[in-house]
Amino acid sequence: MKKLLYLGLLSVCVLLGSCVEKNVFNAFDKVERYMDVYSDSALLLLEQIPHPEKLRGKQRADYVLLLTQARDKNYLDSMQSDSLIKLAVDYYKNGGDNVKAGKALFYYGKVMDLQGNDTLAMQAYLNALAKLEKTEEYKLQGLAYEYIGILNADRKLHKDALDNYQSSVYCFQKAADTLGVIYAYRDIARIYYVEQQYDSVYNYINRALSLCEEKKGCIDFERVTPSLLQVKGIAKRNEGDLENAIILLKTAVETEQDRHSMHHCSMSLGNIYLNQNKLDEAKRYFTLALKSERPRTLAGAYHYLYLLEKRQKKYAMALYFKEKSDSLLSVDLDAKQASQILTLQRKYEKGKLLLEKQQVEHEKKIQFYFGMVIVLFIILL
């Protein structure tokens, strides 16, 4: 009778475990369906899963991958922690699911990028592409190429960046991802802007704007339009077409939803007015940039206000703005140096742990060989 009772209880536990596992996977399926269209709902569903710390194996890996993806799509700073996504990378790296392995590596690359570790970010993106190249995940391949291009552009490797962006366009086109194509066109235009090839800038920006026009009324396409106008506007400014530059940059400032981009655009516009000696208009747009929360942007705004006050021979105010600008640049430099020191410290700690591990293994080998000698000595006796 007791045996039957134990078997019954065991069966109930197995069934309950099976139901819980099934419910979790059902929740994951729903999250994946929501991710691209309703990313906020996807994040909410993940946060409602009870006791995620108790998940193990595939469930744990799937959970942290989806959570990292949802946080990224909702622009949350909590994505900057690499401890979660590393679990997914380690789980999938030797498995047969190249899509999830590639996706985990891609998001690990983004986390490394946010932490300022360009080398690890680049390696992660390249490893992601290696996993994805035989799959049909063209959109993810396009994103990986785009982020590799951004890293190369930051390193002034413009030719490499252009090649990466062109590969990105090809992948987005295969994925029928028009928005991805638009962002890649903008990236290409920015490279040509740096190279001062303005005809090519206008070519790619106009192609991107035409695609936006085809999707008029769609919020994602309306969101990218101001940044396209900004690139075109500063190119017009550099060519001396100030009338069209002002029209384009004004429209960009008025329609830009991203505050950081809007503040940069307002400084570009203010600089044109400063050079035209339209000081009231210049001050208006420089002051707008003072609402930024980023030290480097604020430093730029204060620097332009310093130039403006200096031109009006208001030296006391000019000196005040100059000191504010220098102070913010110093804070930004200190933060970068602190980040570099932290990176070096982590490398040192990792190297130290590796050395300790090697020493332990060496001691184990010595103990093993010593034991063998003792055994042989006893046998020979």
PLM features per residue range, with description:
Residues 39, 77-78, 98, 118, ...:
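TPR-repeat structural position
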Residues 47-52, 86-93, 127-136, 167-171, ...:
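Amphipathic alpha-helical segments of tetratricopeptide repeats
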Residues 74-75, 95, 108, 115, ...:
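Structural motif corresponding to the intra-repeat A-B loop/turn of tetratricopeptide repeats
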Residues 25-43, 51, 79-82, 280, ...:
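Hydrophobic positions within repeat-based interaction scaffolds
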